[in-house]
C-alpha cells in the first residue's frame, strides 16, 4: 500500500462546511441570487499539509547530514592527498606508486557513497513534493465539489448587492490562493507554522460566519459534524404561571419550567429556607415567580364551587311565601303538645319521656294560608339544633309555661332569636293550671328585653292551653300578622336552594335528608349539592310519608338519593351538572380533611407537654350511634363536656344508623363502650359484642344516657382518703422499761384508743411524731382498745422521748368515694 493510499484511507470521509446559497424575491420581479457554497475537506487538507511539512523537514535533515558527510569525505581526501605528497617527498618512488593506488581506491569509494546519498536525498524530495501535490489535489477536489442550493429561510436574506458579493468572493479566493504555489516544499520550509496558523484562523472565521448565518433548515444542512455543541438560549422563556391558594415548591418549578433548585436559591436570597416538597402560600409563590421574571395569574381554589353555585336562573319573579316558624322553649313547657294540637295529630304522645328527640318540620294550613313549623328540642344538650332552627326560620314562637316561668333554655332561645335577628311571639302555655301566673312570666321576660305590647313593646304575647286548645287560633293569627309585617317573598320558579334540617341513614332507603326549601322549586330528578354530599333526587316525601313530585318555598321534604348523610345545617343547592357537583363535593371533603388534620396536628403539639406533665389520665372511650345527625351531635357535645381533669370522655367513633360489625370491632380494639340512641346492633355486631364482652347500652332518653356515663366515670376516679380522729390520751407519767423503753402512763380523755391504729404525738398542740403503737396495756394486761375515762400504759414504737403533758392522738383513714 503506497503512502498516497494510506493518506486517503486515514483522511476523514465526509467532514465539510457549507457556504450560503440564497434565493430572494423582491420588488415585484424575480431576482435569483446564487452564492457558491464551498465545501472544504478541512481536516484532510490540514493533515496532508502537516505530513508534507514533516517529510520536507526530514528531507532537509537528511540533506544536511549528507552534506556534512560529503564535507568530511572531502576533508579526508585532502588530508590523504597531503599525506601522499609528503610521503612522495620522503620515500622512494616504488612506495609512491602503491600509496597513489590506495588513495585512488578510497576516493572512488567516497564518490560512490556521495552518489548514493544524493539519490536518497532526491528520493526524499520527490516524496515530499508528491505529498504536497496530494494535499493540493485534495483541496482542489473539495473546491470542485461546490454546489448551489436554494434557501427558503427568509430570515437569512441580506440586502447586499450582486457586485458587493462578487467582490467579497474574489477577495476570499485571493486570500486562499496566496499559499498555493508550485514549490510546496519550499513554502513549507519558509512558512512554518505561521502560514498554517493564519490559514486555520481564516477557516475558523469562515466556519463561525456560517454558524451565525445558518439557521432553520439551511442551518441544519450547512452545519459540520464537528459543530454539534448545545448552545444555551440567551434569554429565559417567561411564562404565565397559574398559582392556587397553596402550592409546593416542586409544583411551582414545574409550572415555571425551571429546576426546583433555582427556586430554592431564589428564596434563600429572599431570606426564606424551603425544601422541595414544602407548601408555600399564594403570596410567597407570587413573589418568587415575579422575581424570576414570570407573569403570575392568581387562581381561587374554590373557583369551580363559586361558578357552579352562581349558575342560577335569573330574573325570576318573586312571590309571597309562607312563614317558617320555629317553636322554642324550655323542656316540658309544652312545645310539642302545642304543635300537636295545631296539626290535629297525636305525634307528641310518641316522643320518649316527653322530650322531642329530632327536629321536626311540618306545614299546616289555617284560614287559607300556610304556615311551616319547625319543632326543636328543649333539652340543654340540643343547643346546636336550636341554633340551626333559628337560622332557618322567619318567626320564633317562644313557649313559656305559666306555672314554671322563665327557665335556662328559655333564656337561651331568646339569645338564639336575637343572634339570628328573628322576631319573637311569646306563647304563655298551661294557663289552665290553677298555679298558672301569666303576669309573672311577662314581668320576668322584661329583664331580657322582651317587652309585651301591653307595656309598650313590640312583642306579641298570647295565652294558650295546648291541652284544651285555648288561644291557639289567636296564636296562629299573631303568626300570620307578623309574617305580613315581614313581607316574606321568594322565587317560586327556578333552581331550588334550601337548608338541611335533619339527616339520617335508613337501612333500606340509604341516606335520607329533611330539607326545607327556601327558594325555587325542588323537583324529583334534580341534581342536589349538600355540603360534602351530592346526588340526584330519587324520591321526595312530605311529613306524612306521601311521595311528592316537587316542593316550593317554605315546604319541608324528605329527600332520597344523596351520596352520603349530609350534616344538619348544610346548605342544599340544585346545580346543573352532576359531574361538577361531584367535583365540588370532593373538593369540600378534601378541604375539610386538611383542616381537620391541621387541627389534630396543632392539638398534638399543644398537648404534648401538658400530657407529659399530667401523667396518666383515665380515659373513658365511647362509641356513639344514633338515629339522626342532630342527636349524634348533641350526645357527643354533652359527653365531651363531662370530661374532668382526672377522667376524660373520648368519643372514638360516632355516626348515624344502626350499630354495625365495624363499630363492634372498633370498640374491642379501643376498649370502648357502645352507646346506642334509638338504634340497635345487627346480628354480626352482636356476635362480636358477646365474644369480646363489650359493654353495649341502649337509650331512648338523653337524661339516662348522661347519668349512666357519669356513673361510669365516677368509678374511674381515684378515691379520696380522709383522716378521722377516734381517740385522744393525755400523758400523766412516764416509766422506763428495759423491754419497751419509755412507757407513757396516760388517761384517755376523748374517744377510744385502739391498738392497731396509727397515732400522732402532740406537744403544745404541735405534731412532733407520727407512727404506731408498740404496746397498749391496762394494768398488766395487753388490750386492743381503751375507752374514754380509763387509764392505760402506751408504748410508742421507735420513739422514747415522751414527756409528761404530751398528747397521743389516735386516728383512722377513711376512703371516700367520689362522683362527678
Curated annotation (Swiss-Prot):
Residues 375-378 are annotated as: G3. Residues 320-489 form the tr-type G domain. Residues 429-432 are annotated as: G4. Residues 329-336 are annotated as: G1. Signal peptide: none annotated. It is found in: Cytoplasm. Keywords: Cytoplasm, GTP-binding, Initiation factor, Nucleotide-binding, Protein biosynthesis. Residues 465-467 are annotated as: G5. It comes from the Bacteria. Residues 354-358 are annotated as: G2. SUPFAM superfamilies: Initiation factor IF2/eIF5b, domain 3, P-loop containing nucleoside triphosphate hydrolases, Translation proteins. It holds the Pfam family IF-2. InterPro entries: EF-G-like_DII, EFTu-like_2, IF2_II, IF2_N, P-loop_NTPase, Small_GTP-bd, T_Tr_GTP-bd_dom, TF_IF2_bacterial-like. Residues 113-148, 191-214 have a biased composition (Basic and acidic residues). GTP binds at residues 329-336, 375-379, 429-432. The keyword Glycoprotein does not apply. Its main location: cytoplasm. Residues 1-21, 113-234 are annotated as: Disordered. The keyword Cytoplasm applies. One of its GO terms (molecular function) is GTP binding. Residues 180-190 have a biased composition (Basic residues). Belongs to the TRAFAC class translation factor GTPase superfamily. Classic translation factor GTPase family. IF-2 subfamily. One of the essential components for the initiation of protein synthesis. Protects formylmethionyl-tRNA from spontaneous hydrolysis and promotes its binding to the 30S ribosomal subunits. Also involved in the hydrolysis of GTP during the formation of the 70S ribosomal complex. This is Translation initiation factor IF-2. The gene is infB.
Amino acid at each position: 500500500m503506497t503512502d498516497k493510499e494510506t493518506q486517503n484511507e486515514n483522511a476523514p470521509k465526509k467532514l465539510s462546511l457549507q457556504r450560503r446559497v440564497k434565493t430572494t424575491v423582491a420588488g415585484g420581479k424575480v431576482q435569483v441570487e446564487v452564492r457558491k457554497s464551498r465545501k472544504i475537506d478541512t481536516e484532510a487538507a490540514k493533515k496532508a499539509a502537516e505530513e508534507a511539512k514533516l517529510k520536507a523537514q526530514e528531507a532537509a535533515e537528511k540533506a544536511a547530514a549528507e552534506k556534512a558527510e560529503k564535507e568530511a569525505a572531502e576533508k579526508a581526501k585532502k588530508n590523504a592527498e597531503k599525506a601522499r605528497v609528503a610521503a612522495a617527498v620522503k620515500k622512494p618512488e616504488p612506495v609512491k606508486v602503491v600509496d597513489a593506488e590506495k588513495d585512488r581506491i578510497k576516493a572512488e569509494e567516497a564518490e560512490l557513497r556521495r552518489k548514493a546519498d544524493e539519490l536518497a536525498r532526491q528520493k526524499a524530495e520527490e516524496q515530499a513534493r508528491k505529498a504536497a501535490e496530494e494535499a493540493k489535489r485534495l483541496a482542489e477536489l473539495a473546491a470542485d465539489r461546490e454546489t448551489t442550493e436554494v434557501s427558503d429561510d427568509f430570515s437569512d436574506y441580506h440586502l447586499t448587492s450582486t457586485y458587493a458579493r462578487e467582490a467579497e468572493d474574489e477577495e476570499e479566493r485571493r486570500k486562499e490562493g496566496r499559499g498555493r504555489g508550485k514549490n510546496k516544499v519550499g513554502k513549507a520550509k519558509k512558512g512554518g507554522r505561521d502560514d498554517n496558523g493564519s490559514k486555520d484562523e481564516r477557516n475558523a472565521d469562515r466556519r463561525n460566519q456560517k454558524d451565525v448565518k445558518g439557521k432553520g433548515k439551511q442551518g441544519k444542512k450547512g452545519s459540520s459534524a464537528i459543530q454539534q455543541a448545545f448552545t444555551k438560549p440567551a434569554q429565559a422563556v417567561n411564562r404565565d404561571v397559574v398559582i392556587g391558594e397553596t402550592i409546593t415548591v416542586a409544583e411551582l418549578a414545574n409550572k415555571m419550567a425551571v429546576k426546583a433548585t433555582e427556586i430554592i436559591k431564589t428564596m434563600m436570597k429572599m431570606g426564606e429556607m424551603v425544601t422541595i416538597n414544602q407548601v408555600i402560600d399564594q403570596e410567597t409563590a407570587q413573589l418568587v415567580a415575579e422575581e424570576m421574571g414570570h407573569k403570575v395569574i392568581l387562581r381561587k381554589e374554590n373557583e369551580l364551587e363559586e361558578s357552579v353555585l352562581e349558575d342560577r336562573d335569573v330574573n325570576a319573579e318573586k312571590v309571597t311565601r309562607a312563614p317558617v316558624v320555629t317553636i322554642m322553649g324550655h323542656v316540658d313547657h309544652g312545645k310539642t303538645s302545642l304543635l300537636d294540637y295545631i296539626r290535629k295529630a297525636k305525634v307528641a304522645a310518641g316522643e320518649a319521656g316527653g322530650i322531642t328527640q329530632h327536629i321536626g318540620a311540618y306545614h299546616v294550613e289555617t284560614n287559607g294560608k300556610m304556615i311551616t313549623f319547625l319543632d326543636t328540642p328543649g333539652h340543654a344538650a340540643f343547643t346546636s339544633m336550636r341554633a340551626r332552627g333559628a337560622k332557618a326560620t322567619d318567626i320564633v314562637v317562644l313557649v313559656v309555661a305559666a306555672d314554671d316561668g322563665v327557665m335556662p333554655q328559655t333564656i337561651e332561645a331568646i339569645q338564639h332569636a336575637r343572634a339570628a335577628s328573628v322576631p319573637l311571639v311569646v306563647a304563655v302555655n298551661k294557663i289552665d293550671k290553677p298555679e298558672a301566673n301569666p303576669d309573672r312570666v311577662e314581668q320576668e321576660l322584661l329583664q331580657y328585653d322582651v317587652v309585651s305590647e301591653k307595656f309598650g313593646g313590640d312583642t306579641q304575647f298570647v295565652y294558650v292551653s295546648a291541652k284544651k286548645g285555648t288561644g291557639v287560633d289567636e296564636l296562629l293569627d299573631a303568626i300570620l300578622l307578623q309574617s305580613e309585617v315581614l313581607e316574606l317573598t321568594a322565587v317560586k320558579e327556578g333552581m331550588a336552594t334550601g337548608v338541611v334540617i335533619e339527616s339520617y341513614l335508613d337501612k333500606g332507603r340509604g341516606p335520607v335528608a329533611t330539607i326545607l326549601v327556601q327558594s325555587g322549586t325542588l323537583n324529583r330528578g334534580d341534581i342536589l349539592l349538600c355540603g360534602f354530599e351530592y346526588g340526584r333526587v330519587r324520591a321526595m316525601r312530605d311529613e306524612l310519608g306521601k311521595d311528592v313530585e316537587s316542593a316550593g318555598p317554605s315546604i319541608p321534604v324528605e329527600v332520597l338519593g344523596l351520596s352520603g348523610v349530609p350534616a344538619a345545617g348544610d346548605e342544599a343547592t340544585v346545580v346543573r351538572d352532576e359531574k361538577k357537583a361531584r367535583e365540588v363535593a370532593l373538593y369540600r371533603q378534601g378541604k375539610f380533611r386538611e383542616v381537620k388534620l391541621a387541627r389534630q396536628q396543632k392539638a398534638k403539639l399543644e398537648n404534648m407537654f401538658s400530657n407529659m406533665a399530667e401523667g396518666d389520665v383515665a380515659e373513658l372511650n365511647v362509641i356513639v350511634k344514633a338515629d339522626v345527625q342532630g342527636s349524634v351531635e348533641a350526645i357527643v357535645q354533652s359527653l365531651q363536656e363531662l370530661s374532668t381533669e382526672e377522667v376524660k370522655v373520648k368519643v372514638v367513633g360516632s355516626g348515624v344508623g344502626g350499630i354495625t360489625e365495624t363499630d363492634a370491632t372498633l370498640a374491642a380494639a379501643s376498649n370502648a363502650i357502645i352507646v346506642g340512641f334509638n338504634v340497635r346492633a345487627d346480628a354480626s355486631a352482636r356476635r362480636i359484642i358477646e365474644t369480646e364482652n363489650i359493654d353495649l347500652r341502649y337509650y331512648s332518653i338523653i337524661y339516662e344516657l348522661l347519668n349512666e356515663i357519669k356513673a361510669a366515670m365516677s368509678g374511674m376516679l381515684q378515691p379520696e382518703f380522709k383522716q378521722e380522729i377516734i381517740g385522744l390520751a393525755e400523758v400523766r407519767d412516764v416509766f422506763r422499761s428495759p423491754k419497751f423503753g419509755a412507757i407513757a402512763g396516760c388517761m384517755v380523755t376523748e374517744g377510744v384508743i385502739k391498738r392497731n391504729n396509727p397515732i400522732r404525738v402532740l406537744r403544745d398542740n404541735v405534731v412532733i411524731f407520727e407512727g404506731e403503737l408498740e404496746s397498749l396495756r391496762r394494768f398488766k394486761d395487753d388490750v386492743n382498745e381503751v375507752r374514754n375515762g380509763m387509764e392505760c400504759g402506751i408504748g410508742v414504737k421507735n420513739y422514747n422521748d415522751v414527756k409528761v403533758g404530751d398528747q397521743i392522738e389516735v386516728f383512722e383513714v377513711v376512703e371516700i368515694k367520689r362522683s362527678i
